[in-house]
Amino acid sequence: MAPISLSWLLRLATFCHLTVLLAGQHHGVTKCNITCSKMTSKIPVALLIHYQQNQASCGKRAIILETRQHRLFCADPKEQWVKDAMQHLDRQAAALTRNGGTFEKQIGEVKPRTTPAAGGMDESVVLEPEATGESSSLEPTPSSQEAQRALGTSPELPTGVTGSSGTRLPPTPKAQDGGPVGTELFRVPPVSTAATWQSSAPHQPGPSLWAEAKTSEAPSTQDPSTQASTASSPAPEENAPSEGQRVWGQGQSPRPENSLEREEMGPVPAHTDAFQDWGPGSMAHVSVVPVSSEGTPSREPVASGSWTPKAEEPIHATMDPQRLGVLITPVPDAQAATRRQAVGLLAFLGLLFCLGVAMFTYQSLQGCPRKMAGEMAEGLRYIPRSCGSNSYVLVPV
């Protein structure tokens, strides 16, 4: 019984070693990084930023939730609050992927803006010439009267005749209703008339709005009798423009107040040829283009048939840095897994070699020499039970 038990022990040891090697290789290939022993309770959706499902090799299915502090919790995928949280996170990820970020439009408060003289946006009103040839006096037309009523100024047009210098005066800041506004005077050769009207601030409901105009005089080589000065008068309360309206002149490109880029306007790109034949005996009127209350200019044709350019509002992109956290799971190294498999295979082969050597040695030790095979006595052979044993077995010959 002793030799049989020893061989079975060797076989059992070989089987156990082989089982351990195979189990180690199996665990080396699996990718179960998080083992969920218990499920968490309900977590507010506002604290979650990411979720993922655990690996199939983990056995028990669970949802791994990540909070803003990058803490991981196991949740049961069958619960309703877990399903709602997964849908909420999926919608957030879809919106972030579609837009590439959260785009927000900057809308400033309704208050007068201060336009610096050097960096602000220049606003000017360009008068369109209309040659009459009959009278050299400046008479208000119906469109100019409507502009006067909208601006709250006197019937006299605040115009100034400039010389043919072809230069451009710097904008003059004026204070009105809480802040200065930049105005600009253009000179167009040979002789042009430019108005220095104030761009009115956003109208607010309440008491009547007073408009203030300042006389602008430019150097001129013409007769002083052709120069007209501006005058200011209080606007009647019933003629005050409604809330959100603004009067723009022809050739002016209205820009939203929240624009961060400074764009300078060129000297009248559309009606340059109309000023060539405009003499001192001509008459000018103002083209009025209504603007909607939301701040975007309406594309309506002006008196000369041209279209006002459409302003483009800047879009500022902001991204939430907390939403950009990506849970990176460690990927097992392929070379390390191959190395572990090679080491396990070599160990298994070595164990088999050692087992073979041990069994050969055991069998060699169990064999007895021929001289101890027994002696013949009266037709019987004495065979010892084992090598070195004093007990014999009688075997008939």
Curated annotation (Swiss-Prot):
Residues 128-265, 289-309 are annotated as: Disordered. Its main location: membrane. Residues 133-147, 193-202 have a biased composition (Polar residues). Residues 101-341 are annotated as: Mucin-like stalk. Changing R61E: Dominant-negative mutant, reduced binding to integrins ITGAV:ITGB3 and ITGA4:ITGB1, no effect on binding to CX3CR1, defective in ternary complex formation, integrin activation and fractalkine signaling and suppression of leukocyte recruitment in the peritonitis model in vivo. It comes from the Eukaryota. Chemokine that acts as a ligand for both CX3CR1 and integrins ITGAV:ITGB3 and ITGA4:ITGB1. The CX3CR1-CX3CL1 signaling exerts distinct functions in different tissue compartments, such as immune response, inflammation, cell adhesion and chemotaxis. Regulates leukocyte adhesion and migration processes at the endothelium. Can activate integrins in both a CX3CR1-dependent and CX3CR1-independent manner. In the presence of CX3CR1, activates integrins by binding to the classical ligand-binding site (site 1) in integrins. (Microbial infection) Mediates the cytoadherence of erythrocytes infected with parasite P.falciparum (strain 3D7) with endothelial cells by interacting with P.falciparum CBP1 and CBP2 expressed at the surface of erythrocytes. The adhesion prevents the elimination of infected erythrocytes by the spleen. This is Fractalkine. It comes from Homo sapiens (Human). The gene is CX3CL1.
